[in-house]
């Protein structure tokens, strides 16, 4: 109730401040919807760039468009945005999806997220996640795939357009809950009044210890102009609350400190343009982006646990992830007015996106503390001979004197240089199996090696023996063995043994690298035409697009060794063929032991994949018309047609192979008692069966919006729009076969559909500001979901000795529908009209409340809790300094508004998610000062009161199963790892000329 009173109070204050607007100027209708691929003539375009480079909807006195927010470069600079999460920090109803070690993965808007919110950069759709629930069930909880949507470098962006609600007119497939559209900068943004521009910007943020440097160069020479924006960022993991005091030694799911990662990001934007005449413009552009993250998954639940340095470490999990995007484009613009267009733009783009997850399992505790290289006795090589750590001869515990007067020793008890006895830490190896590498050991003629001669073939009691070495060349290298390794009957002398450290002498490294590649070639034609029919104005935008996208997965894995020590085995040796009586020199190709020797026989497995490579062809045409009937009435009419064709492109022997076991016998049964060749043939037949299932989709999208200005201070906006999302290739074609979890492909899926209805009331005045209230409702249908299809019997076992067992089968189908309703308030009031001393001050308020349910009264987890943002801002009249003070309040996530999809599997009657976000209020203070014309200093304090809180998006990223992003579900230990940073700071300095 307190929150409700607060909302009413805020609304009343804003309403009162905007009430005296009866004498405002005549209104002008603004289009409520515009496609992303829009152009205008040269003068209009330059004017638009000028405006967008300095202001945005919420900064101007123009009322906002319905369900649309524009963030410009100036706003992003003012808010000190460093990543996509910062873009929507002070927006309500839009958040960023958290993806653990991989960072962020797209946006959540109006109850849906990731692939159901479109993301475009310069008209190009960005990489989509593998959204098949089957794939997520199998792989996502284990950190093996970088299954995220790629981001963008903030410093290269001219504008970010955020649309809430269905709107495929702008973005095509994927815009169910909304869209986020990025536009990159252009040289013309900076060269309005001069022929050059230079900027250097350096910043730092304490939340992740990130520093960044950005250099911007723009210039014009005769008919050419160019732009270069290059940015480099270096930082580490986001520091959760109480990061500096958290225990850094705890490992596993109970770890409370964020896992350590080194994060780097490089971005370069290049644009070169040629204007042969004022009506023609050619542009060649390159947008290069790479995000890298390297570190350790210390919260990984399968991490080998040790209590301290008293026990050697076996291995730990290291990560080396990467997201790389490269877009090369060429565009031609024509500004000659013709009966068919006022502006024309033709663009060809070649975009390649790679998201990579790499993990390396190896010990990094140092040679002394790693099990593979431990040498507690301190044995070393001194001038080619084995000695103690100080170079003296080896010593063992004396046991007595033999009958011949020689001393006997306990060769299991080593005497260190400090006279400490070390028991059981040496390896006494059979002399016949011990090969000394002559590049390390002294193998000269007559050289003798001190070895152990036991009293028996077993045990550790024996005496010293000096034996000559016998050299031999194996595979081009010289090795030596003890000459006395044979007895008088030429049998192995099991009493003679070598003395070496007990560890293998190298560290094993098991690595795997998994790539998701999305390569797109796209051709766009965009035209605009302004004309009148009678007294009705038309602002027409139309065009078409054609693109091909190849999406594939490539998995690599291998096994090798690092930190090789002097005692490591350097050869596989020889084996004796009893049939021929000959010794055979072993190689990695002939010995069975190679599978266990990472140093001598490292391996790289053949490339494989869990997905068929899919080529997608998309064709689309769109038409958008802003129809201005009078100064008081206008309409926006939009239509788009999409044709999408999926074609699997699998070539046997060329394409990375699908594992045999996940497809054999799946659709085409195995013959009775098949041999290995028949199994191989059956695998190919089943892959061919899936690969021949091409699929086509056709989609019609539309949008209708009306803007009515009954008075000079009141605006009414209505909107009705339809969006769609075609099934992704993995949702249709992903196949997996296992007794517990078999996934069948389904090429009969229908597109997901969203329809949005929205109405907005706005009070506005050029001098006072605006307050806008909107009500919305979005209906979703044909959500794609994974369902259990029953059991089927499949043959299992070795060829020729199979049996049949039942497999649980699952398949994606169109099932769920959903409804999301809500209310939003957006307002900004300029206080200068109230009193002269308040000139430059402004108040703002944003509020979003939404509620949604799927069929069966199931809550939608992607809906954010009730959120409000209060703002107080000031700008000096000459822009010498200014500040913004934001108060963000987020309500608790109620248990009845959450749904645990695994509750049934866990035999829980309570289907709510156990660990949720509580209500919190955050204060941020941001300011800037311009002491001289060419210098701007910005600084900010975030979470001013050092509040401990967790966002709902972080809380819902906690997985109830798997090995990554998990906590102790019973006690909650480990959840602090997901908390937001405490009080933190940002600062940047920018020089402009």
Curated annotation (Swiss-Prot):
Residue ranges constituting the TBDR beta-barrel domain according to the UniProt record: 193-993
Chain ranges of the TBDR plug domain: 58-185
Main location group: membrane
Gene Ontology terms for molecular function: siderophore uptake transmembrane transporter activity
Sequence repeat placement: 26-29, 30-33, 34-37
Keyword Transferase: no
Compartments where located: Cell outer membrane
UniProt motif TonB box: location: 47-54
Motif TonB C-terminal box, chain ranges: 976-993
Positions of the UniProt region annotated as 3 X 4 AA tandem repeats of Q-P-T-N: 26-37
Keyword Coiled coil found: no
Additional remarks: This protein is subject to phase-variable expression associated with alteration in the length of the CCAA repeat region. This mechanism is called slipped-strand mispairing. Addition or loss of CCAA repeat units would change the reading frame and result in introduction of stop codons downstream of the repeat region. This may be a mechanism of regulation and a way to avoid the immunological response of the host.
The protein's name: Hemoglobin-binding protein C
Organism of origin: Haemophilus influenzae
């Amino acid at each position: 109730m307190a929150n409700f009173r607060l909302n009413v109070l805020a609304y009343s204050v804003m309403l009162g401040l905007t009430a005296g607007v009866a004498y405002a100027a005549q209104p002008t209708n603004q289009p409520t919807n515009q496609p992303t691929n829009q152009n205008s003539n040269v003068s209009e375009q330059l004017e638009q760039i000028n405006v967008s480079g300095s202001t945005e909807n919420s900064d101007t006195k123009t009322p906002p468009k319905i369900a649309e927010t524009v963030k410009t470069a100036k706003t992003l600079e003012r808010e000190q945005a460093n990543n996509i999460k910062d873009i929507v920090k002070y927006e309500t109803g839009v958040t960023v999806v958290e993806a653990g070690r991989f960072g962020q993965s797209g946006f959540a808007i109006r109850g849906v997220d990731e692939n159901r919110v479109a993301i475009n950069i310069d008209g190009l759709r960005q990489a989509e996640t593998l959204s098949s629930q089957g794939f997520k069930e199998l792989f996502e909880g284990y950190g093996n795939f970088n299954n995220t949507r790629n981001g963008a470098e903030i410093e290269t962006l001219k504008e970010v357009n955020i649309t809430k609600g269905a709107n495929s007119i702008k973005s095509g497939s994927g815009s169910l809950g909304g869209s986020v559209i990025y536009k990159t900068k252009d040289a013309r943004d900076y060269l309005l009044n001069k022929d050059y521009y230079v900027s250097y910007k350096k910043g730092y943020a304490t939340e992740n210890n990130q520093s960044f440097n950005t250099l911007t160069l723009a210039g014009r020479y005769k008919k050419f102009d160019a732009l270069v924006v290059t940015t480099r960022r270096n930082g580490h993991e986001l520091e959760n609350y109480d990061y500096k005091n958290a225990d850094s030694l705890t490992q596993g799911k109970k770890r409370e400190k964020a896992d350590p990662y080194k994060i780097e990001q490089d971005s370069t934007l290049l644009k070169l343009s040629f204007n042969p005449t004022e009506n023609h413009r050619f542009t060649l552009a390159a947008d290069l982006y790479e995000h890298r993250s390297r570190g350790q998954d210390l919260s990984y639940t399968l991490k080998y646990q040790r209590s301290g340095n008293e026990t050697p470490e076996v291995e730990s999990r290291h990560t080396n992830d990467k997201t790389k995007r490269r877009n090369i484009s060429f565009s031609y613009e024509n500004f000659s007015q013709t009966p068919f267009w006022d502006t024309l733009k033709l663009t060809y783009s070649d975009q390649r996106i790679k998201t990579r997850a790499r993990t390396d399992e190896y010990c990094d505790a140092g040679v002394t503390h790693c099990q593979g290289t431990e040498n507690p006795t301190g044995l070393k090589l001194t001038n080619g001979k084995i000695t103690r750590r100080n170079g003296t001869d080896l010593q063992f515990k004396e046991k007595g004197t033999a009958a011949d007067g020689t001393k006997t020793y306990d060769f299991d008890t080593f005497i260190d240089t400090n006279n400490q006895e070390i028991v059981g830490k040496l390896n006494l190896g059979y002399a016949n199996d011990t090969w000394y590498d002559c590049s390390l050991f002294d193998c000269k003629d007559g050289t003798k090696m001190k070895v152990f001669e036991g009293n028996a073939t077993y045990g550790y009691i024996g005496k010293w023996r000096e034996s000559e070495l016998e050299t031999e060349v194996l595979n081009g290298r010289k090795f030596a063995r003890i000459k006395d390794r044979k007895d008088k009957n030429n049998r192995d002398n099991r009493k003679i043994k070598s003395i070496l450290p007990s560890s293998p002498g190298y560290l094993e490294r098991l690595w795997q690298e998994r790539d998701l590649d999305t390569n797109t070639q796209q051709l766009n034609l965009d035209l605009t035409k302004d004309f009148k029919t009678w007294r009705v104005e038309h602002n027409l935008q139309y065009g078409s697009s054609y693109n091909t996208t190849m999406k594939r997965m490539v998995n690599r894995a291998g096994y090798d060794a690092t930190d090789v020590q002097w005692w490591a085995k350097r050869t596989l040796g020889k084996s004796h063929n009893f049939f021929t009586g000959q010794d055979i020199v072993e190689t990695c190709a002939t010995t069975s032991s190679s599978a266990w020797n990472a140093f001598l026989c490292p391996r790289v497995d053949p490339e494989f994949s869990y997905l068929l490579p899919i080529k997608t062809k998309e064709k689309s045409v769109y038409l958008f018309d802003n129809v201005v009937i009078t100064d008081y009435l206008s309409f926006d009419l939009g239509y788009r047609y999409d044709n999408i064709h999926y074609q699997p492109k699998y070539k046997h022997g060329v394409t990375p192979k699908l594992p045999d076991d996940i497809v054999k016998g799946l659709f085409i049964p195995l013959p009775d008692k098949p041999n290995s060749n028949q199994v191989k043939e059956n695998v190919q037949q089943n892959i061919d069966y899936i690969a021949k299932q091409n699929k086509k989709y056709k989609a019609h999208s539309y949008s209708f919006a009306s803007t009515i200005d009954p008075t000079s201070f009141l605006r009414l906006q209505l909107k009705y729009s339809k969006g769609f999302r075609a099934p992704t290739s993995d949702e249709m074609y992903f196949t997996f076969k296992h007794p517990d979890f078999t996934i069948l492909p389904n090429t009969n899926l229908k597109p997901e559909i969203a329809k949005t209805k929205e109405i907005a009331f706005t009070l506005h005045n050029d001098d006072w500001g605006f307050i806008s209230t909107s009500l919305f409702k979005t209906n979703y249908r044909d959500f794609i979901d994974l369902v259990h299809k029953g059991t089927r019997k499949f043959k299992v076992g070795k060829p020729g000795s199979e049996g049949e067992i039942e497999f649980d089968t699952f398949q994606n189908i169109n099932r769920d529908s959903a409804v999301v309703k809500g209310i939003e308030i957006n307002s900004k009031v300029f206080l200068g009209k109230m009193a002269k001393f308040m000139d430059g001050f402004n108040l703002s308020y944003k509020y979003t409340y939404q509620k949604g349910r799927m069929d069966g009264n199931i809550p939608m987890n992607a809906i954010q809790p009730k959120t409000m943002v209060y703002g107080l801002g000031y700008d000096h009249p000459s822009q010498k300094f200014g500040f913004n003070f934001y108060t963000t309040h987020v309500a608790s996530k109620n248990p009845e508004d959450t749904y645990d999809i695994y509750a049934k599997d866990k035999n829980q009657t309570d289907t709510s998610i156990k660990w949720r976000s509580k209500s919190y209020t955050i204060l941020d203070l941001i300011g800037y000062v311009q002491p001289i014309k060419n210098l701007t200093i910005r600084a900010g304090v975030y979470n001013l009161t050092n509040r401990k809180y967790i966002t709902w998006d972080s809380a819902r990223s906690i997985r109830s199963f798997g090995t990554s992003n998990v906590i102790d579900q019973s006690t909650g230990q480990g959840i602090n790892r997901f908390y937001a940073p405490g009080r933190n700071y940002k600062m940047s300095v920018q020089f402009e000329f």
